[in-house]
Each structure stands twice: as C-alpha cells, then as structure tokens.
C-alpha cells in the first residue's frame, strides 16, 4: 500500500478517526507491512461556514442556512461561487446573504456579456495581457486552493470585458472556459448558445508567459 495523495477534512477529524488511522499505519510500518510511516502525502483542513451571527450553525440557535433553499432561489452555480469566494479555504467564514447576492450579480453580468458579441472586437494589448495573466493566475490559485482569489481574477476580467463596446466569441469562450470549473451549469449553457462543443471536453487554455507583461 502507498500513501493517500490528498486528505481533506475538518479539524474535528484530527483527534478522532484520523488519530487512530495514523496509529495503525505507524504500527503496520513498525512490523514491516507497509513502506511508509505516514498514511498521507498532503493533509488539508477546510474552514467551516458559520451562521450569519458568526456562530457555528445549529438548529437550536436558529442560524442554519438550508442550501436547498439557496439553490432554488439563486441557482447551484451562484451558491458554488459564493462558497468558494467567502474567504481562505482553510478559515471559517460567516454566511452573508448580501455577498451571495453579489455573486448572483456577477453571474448575471457574465450572461449579459453575450449581448456584446460582435466580430468587431474591442481588442487591445492590455486586454491580451489581462487574459494571459488571468489564465496563469487561475492555474496557480486552483492548484493552491486559492479559490477566492481565483474568482477575484475572473471578476476583474469580466469587468474589463464589460467596459468594451463589443467582444468576440473567442474572447467570450475563453471566459466561459475559465469560469467553468466553478460554475459549470451556466457556462456550458452559454457555451452551447454561441455554438461551441462542450467545455468539459475542451483543452484548458494555455497562457503565453511573454504576454503576461504589457510592453512599455
């Protein structure tokens, strides 16, 4: 047996089953039955979504947020974006309906950008640099679980698109590809509407490092 590549769980796991699992692996290692002293290569603890009152959600406190209700009102993609945007992955964060609505406005803006599609692009060198920087940033952030900063980068790109009079289908498709891991439903639907094959079957965009810095 080899080590588990990635173990993800809350801090409550540390003094419960994880403690005993590690004990057994140490024992098996000592008697020569497994090749590694530890059972995990990487251990990550995720934060907890707290209630709006900054306390742990509890029915007795009346501060529980039902995700089914959120999905019905705002959609699964908005909930997914908000949960990733709340803060550092490993830190607790209180629920904020105002911030959730902000994520809904972000998704609405992405949808409205489709109305700007035109063969005459408002392309500039600074936009090309921003696109390449965004791809590079998202690759790094996704790998290092920086989901909140990943979404911030996408918001900057969306705002840049929104300031243009028009954007090409290729530029819009790039945005949809980058947003797809976070909001798969709306991006696949928009992608189909502009005539492309499924994003989930496409190659991830490749950035040009030489174009991540604007010429002066």
Label the predicted regions:
Residues 1-91:
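Alpha-helical recognition segments enriched in aromatics with Gly/Pro capping
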Residues 19, 36-37, 69-216:
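Helix-rich, typically C-terminal accessory recognition domains appended to large enzymatic cores
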């Amino acid at each position: 047996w080899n080590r588990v590549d990635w173990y993800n769980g809350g801090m409550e796991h540390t003094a419960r089953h994880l403690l005993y699992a590690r004990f057994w692996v140490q024992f098996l290692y000592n008697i020569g039955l497994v090749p590694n002293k530890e059972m995990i290569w990487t251990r990550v603890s995720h934060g907890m979504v707290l209630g709006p009152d900054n306390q742990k959600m509890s029915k007795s406190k009346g501060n529980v947020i039902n995700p089914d209700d959120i999905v019905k009102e705002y959609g699964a993609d908005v909930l997914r974006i908000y949960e990733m945007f709340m803060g550092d992955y490993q830190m607790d964060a209180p629920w904020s309906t105002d911030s959730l609505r902000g994520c809904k406005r972000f998704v609405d803006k992405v949808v409205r950008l489709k109305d700007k599609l035109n063969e005459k692009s408002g392309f500039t060198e600074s936009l090309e640099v921003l696109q390449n920087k965004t791809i590079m940033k998202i690759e790094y952030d996704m790998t290092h679980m920086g989901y909140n900063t990943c979404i911030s980068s996408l918001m900057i790109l969306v705002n840049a698109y929104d300031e243009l009079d028009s954007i090409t289908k290729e530029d819009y498709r790039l945005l949809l590809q980058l947003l797809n891991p976070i909001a798969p439903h709306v991006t696949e639907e928009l992608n189909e509407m502009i005539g492309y094959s499924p994003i989930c079957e496409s190659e991830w965009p490749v950035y040009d490092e030489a174009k991540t810095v604007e010429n002066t």
